[in-house]
């Protein structure tokens, strides 16, 4: 991905200055897509003076699903504690370890070799921590065998078409750039608080894997590159904060969807979830989940992970989607909560009438209509 990392000659012994320079230029394609001017001068000015003192360490990734959002967030957090200039390199592509999105989109898979390049007062400590993280599978439990899936019985309920509240986004702003930037920062802060609440909710229910998902979302949203890209759009387009943020996160979502790794590809819905939550705060749109009094099957094109965590499994018996992915965090959360999940049903889903009784067969990924 041109927007993620430049092709560099690090593996063949190139100067570290060249490695860093090329990696910093990896953002040029994204800047052009967003209509921003070239940042060549800016990159040259911000490039640290790397030399032969830089150290590196390569590890082989043993996480079954590679470095997806959760282990990547652990890596970002750990390396952020060291006073050193660092790059991560895989197959000649480099990204900064400050950005969970760049790491995730680097598509580091099982058995891939990942190298950390570091220079600075705590470079050695960073390399040691990197090696320890790899040995610990970046905080994930190594599965020696596939988990035994519990049989999921068919679930039934009345059909309810669900869609999140629509946020109206205006492009033209009547405020100053500084005022729009402050609006965006506040909305991001409110969304980060939302994510902390969701993490605590999952932890209180003993759902540690789900808590880790929303902790990863917190790290994903707190990526300084996202705010920087939106701030530049505000400067050059004189647009609203919601318009700038929508452009940046939609582009990121599309990058995830274009990956050839199905597991990482499914993470686009997480980005869409974060965008939606931030837009709700920016536009001050009121959003409340519907309440149900009888067994219900939710029908939708797709559904956000944060929405599912807030559902009551005692009433919402199943979720049936026209799109979606069985590898998404939404699917994982539904399964953990005991909510039936079938997806990729296509247009036939929309032939169902509201309040019609449905039965979902999770095992066969099919639904049946009463009568």
Description of each model-found segment:
Residues 1, 38, 42-47, 70, ...:
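Glycine-rich, charged/polar anion/phosphate-binding loops
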Residues 1-58:
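ATP-dependent carboxylate/acyl-activation modules
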Residues 2-4, 84, 112:
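A short pocket-lining beta-strand/turn micro-motif at the edge of beta-sheets
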Residues 45-47, 102-105:
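Short beta-strand/turn micro-motifs at beta-sheet edges
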Residues 56-58, 65, 70, 77-80, ...:
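Non-catalytic, soluble scaffold/interaction modules
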Residues 94-103:
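Short amphipathic beta-strand starts and helix->beta connectors
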């Amino acid at each position: 991905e041109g927007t993620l990392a430049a092709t560099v000659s690090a593996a063949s012994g190139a100067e570290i200055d060249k490695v860093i320079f090329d990696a910093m230029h990896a953002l040029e394609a994204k800047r052009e897509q967003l209509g921003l001017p070239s940042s060549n001068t800016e990159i040259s000015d911000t490039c640290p003076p790397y030399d032969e003192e830089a150290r590196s360490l390569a590890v082989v990734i043993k996480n079954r699903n590679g470095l997806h959002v959760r282990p990547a967030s652990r890596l970002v957090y750990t390396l952020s504690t060291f006073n050193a200039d660092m790059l991560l390199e895989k197959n000649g592509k480099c990204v900064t370890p400050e950005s969970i999105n760049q790491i995730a989109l680097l598509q580091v898979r099982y058995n891939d070799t990942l190298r950390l390049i570091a220079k600075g007062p705590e470079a050695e400590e960073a390399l040691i921590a990197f090696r320890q993280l790899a040995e610990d599978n970046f905080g994930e439990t190594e599965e020696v065998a596939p988990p035994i899936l519990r049989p999921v019985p068919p679930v039934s309920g009345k059909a309810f078409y669900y869609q999140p509240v629509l946020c109206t986004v205006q492009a033209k702003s009547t405020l100053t750039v500084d005022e729009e930037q402050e609006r965006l920062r506040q909305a991001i802060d409110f969304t980060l608080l939302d994510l902390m609440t969701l993490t605590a909710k999952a932890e209180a229910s003993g759902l540690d894997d789900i808590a880790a998902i929303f902790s990863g979302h917190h790290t994903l949203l707190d990526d300084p590159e996202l705010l920087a890209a939106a701030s530049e759009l505000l400067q050059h387009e004189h647009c609203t904060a919601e318009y700038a943020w929508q452009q940046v996160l939609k582009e990121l979502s599309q990058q995830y969807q274009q990956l050839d790794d199905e597991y990482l590809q499914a993470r686009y819905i997480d980005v869409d979830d974060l965008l939606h939550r931030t837009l709700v705060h920016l536009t001050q749109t009121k959003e409340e989940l519907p309440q149900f009094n009888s067994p219900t099957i939710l029908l939708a094109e797709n559904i956000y992970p944060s929405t599912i965590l807030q559902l009551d499994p005692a009433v919402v018996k199943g979720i049936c989607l026209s799109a979606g992915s069985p590898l998404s965090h939404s699917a994982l959360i539904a399964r953990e909560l005991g909510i039936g999940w079938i997806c990729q049903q296509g247009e036939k889903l929309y032939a169902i009438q509201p309040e019609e009784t449905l039965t979902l067969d999770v095992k066969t990924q099919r639904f049946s209509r009463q009568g």
